[in-house]
Amino acid sequence: MALNVFQKQEVVKELAGVATKAHSLIVAEYAGITVPQMTAMRKQARESGVYLKVVKNKLAARALGDTEYAVIKEKLIGPLLYAFSLEDPGAAGRLIKEFSKKHDKLKSKAVSLGGVLYPAGHVDVLASLPTRLQALAMLARVLSEPVTLFARAIKAMADDKSETFAVSSPETSEA
């Protein structure tokens, strides 16, 4: 379906708005993916906080032109799918990686994070990033570790003193 000028402007405006809020962008080739497979992927994307869109490359280049994702313009060749991580930086990476395991037709083409263009192989790195909740749990564990070690040391010292006192008490009473 051909879009008129006003519809194209709306698409560019929408994509630019999403790009300014997104943490990361993955561009992937989707040629050969069936409609039911794409529908399942879109459903999975909505559930994981990923904005998934198939847009003409010319419109995408215009939309991304004034954002940190302008670095990806040189990779916009052929039919592409744009996956923006809205909630955490690794969400789109996990989605694309998981979906491409089941469907070999989906191939990542480029990754952009923080205004830097990375090769397609960096999808695995992006997918391995912890979610916000996982990162907070790791931070809490790291912060609580010294306190836990200190408490264990105090307990061990108290146990040693009580054992020493229990062992030395009978000897002193005999002497």
Swiss-Prot record:
GO terms for biological process: translation. Transmembrane segments: none annotated. Keywords: Ribonucleoprotein, Ribosomal protein, RNA-binding, rRNA-binding. InterPro entries: Ribosomal_uL10 (IPR001790), Ribosomal_uL10-like_sf (IPR043141), Ribosomal_uL10_bac (IPR022973), Ribosomal_uL10_bac_type (IPR047865), Ribosomal_uL10_CS_bac (IPR002363). It comes from the Bacteria. One of its GO terms (cellular component) is large ribosomal subunit. PANTHER family: 39S RIBOSOMAL PROTEIN L10, MITOCHONDRIAL. Part of the ribosomal stalk of the 50S ribosomal subunit. The N-terminus interacts with L11 and the large rRNA to form the base of the stalk. The C-terminus forms an elongated spine to which L12 dimers bind in a sequential fashion forming a multimeric L10(L12)X complex. HAMAP family: Ribosomal_uL10. This is Large ribosomal subunit protein uL10.
